């Protein structure tokens, strides 16, 4: 944990600056999506107009990681357990997409949120 904290202390300012430059380069776009696993830890949420979390049940996430990344179950669970709990995202994010169905449902929910954000 100490070495990771030191690595984050060194790299976060550079990652933040590069991310902000990339976002600003898209200023003509009506929406810019910024996928950042450490958004809040890096303080990058302060340059976001809206923050969206996409959440799924724990077991669903485990099986998706195993299938996508070909990891053993223990590694998939460890990856999830290293992340903040869903309650953290529910408290911090303005919008939540519940990704507990099929892709059609996810697309429908994402499009509905897009329509809200574009108003």
Protein language model regions, located:
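Alpha-helix N-capping/helix-start residues
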Residues: 1-2, 58-59, 73
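ATP-dependent small-molecule kinase phosphotransfer cores
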Residues: 1-30
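Residue-level recognition of specific faces of alpha-helices
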Residues: 3-6, 35-36, 50-53, 64, ...
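Small-molecule kinase domains that catalyze NTP-dependent phosphoryl transfer to phosphate-bearing small molecules
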Residues: 15-19, 28, 46-47, 67, ...
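Switch II (G3) loop of P-loop NTPases
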Residues: 30-41
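Conserved phosphate-donor/acceptor-positioning beta-strand/loop module used by diverse small-molecule
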Residues: 33, 45-69, 97
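Conserved nucleotide-binding/hydrolysis micro-motifs of P-loop NTPases
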Residues: 39, 57-60, 102-103
């Amino acid at each position: 944990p100490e070495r990771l904290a030191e690595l984050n202390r060194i790299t976060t300012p550079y990652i933040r600056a590069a991310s902000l430059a990339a976002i600003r380069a898209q200023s003509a776009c009506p929406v810019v999506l910024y996928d950042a696993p450490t958004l809040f830890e890096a303080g990058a949420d302060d340059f976001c107009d809206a923050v969206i979390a996409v959440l799924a049940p724990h077991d669903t996430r485990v099986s998706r990681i195993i299938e996508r990344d070909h990891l053993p179950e223990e590694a998939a669970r460890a990856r999830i357990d290293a992340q903040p709990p869903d309650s953290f995202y529910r408290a911090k994010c303005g919008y939540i997409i519940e990704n507990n169905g099929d892709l059609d449902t996810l697309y429908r929910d994402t499009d509905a949120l897009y329509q809200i954000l574009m108003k």
